[in-house]
């Protein structure tokens, strides 16, 4: 426990702060002492001696006053202190094994002569810090560095003849290894030129291979654009279904044979192999393009038993589609895959919707009872419309199949999208019910609710603000005030003429009744509420 001088116990925080203050004072004292010592060490004892000598000469002449005597005494003390501190510093540095550094050996800053000024303004190559008699005679700085001159660093120290000769010999020795590299450079340039004669011959060689490869690379890229890896697996599954349906899988095999034939037309080794691989990919795409033509028939079986005639017609259409695919194989590759799924609904459509061709035309298909079908039905009318110009009957639906099969070369897209067509099958099943359903409900479904629940007029300040002050008076204070009655009727009659003359008559009758009966303000307020109700303000 620390106590003050009076014997009182100090607060621990105050005691701690007092200790910190003492430590800070000690630290400041040491710092001031160091600064003083450094200032003493920087002083030149010779200058102090010169000043003392001048004062002694003045003392001999008898012109030394009291102030100069005091100054002389201070100079003598500082001289003794400087010598003492220097001696201590030298001893400390010797103990540490370091050489003492004194600042007194540096004279006052010297101004440059006119010659040095001129030389600084117009430097010579020899003044450059990067100058070398043989390697860099111009003194140019290396790239990325600013020019540096010895004159800006300090005075040049002229080299003696021996040193100059030794430096020249050293520079020659250093220069000897450097010149050898330049000769090989021209040799390498010549070799490069010699190789250049071969390089031009080799340069034209690379270009020829690329031209034949672009088609293959383009085919490969096109193949990659229509996922090639997934395509092969689906076709093997459907072919058995096609066989069951009664259609032979010969078309895919024929394009494969044709694909085997193209490679020979003029390629060497690797090029032939690349072409074979690319053509095999193309053949796979062709086979996949023709397989879908046979794939459409399978969907009808799950739909209805009328698949047999429809499948035949689908087979004929598929053959025509296969011909179109063979003729236009490049177009389907560039066309986006989304269209193919829309073809499937059109394929089963002919067999399911021949009896109701007129239902396909109207855009009101979205009004069918099942909620899920409307979106696909909204999408269907535009698809069915193009076929109708060719023919109003279901054969017209087959017309879009001829141009659209090329859009669906990838069979991979068709298997996952059968879930989309089922709504169309259901629509075919409900074909008998379609004509009875009105088309207006579709608009009603899309319409937003018009009835909005509003608060009562008594609770809306916007409407109560319209009520006259005479009516808004409390019932307790309303009894003595019977004069405002005519004003209420007048205000009501004046406000209502612009709105509706019929309401004005009713309001006049209502206002006349209280006048004749001489009832209280409550009756007039009820009449006002009736007027407001007639205007539609109290509709809930």
Curated annotation (Swiss-Prot):
Compositionally biased tracts (Basic and acidic residues): 112-129
Gene Ontology terms: biological process: flower development; regulation of photoperiodism, flowering; RNA processing
Intracellular or extracellular location(s): Nucleus
Compositionally biased spans, kind Polar residues: 307-330
Tissues expressing this chain: Moslty expressed in leaves and flowers, and, at lower levels, in flushes, roots and fruits. Present in rapidly proliferating tissues, such as shoot apical meristem, leaf primordium, and flower organ primordium.
Gene Ontology annotations for the cellular component aspect, listed alphabetically: nucleus; spliceosomal complex
Motif (Nuclear localization signal 2): 71-78
Stretches for region Disordered: 90-429
Pfam families (alphabetical): Wbp11
Motif (Nuclear localization signal 1): 16-23
Protein name: Protein EARLY FLOWERING 5
Organism: Poncirus trifoliata
Originating gene: ELF5
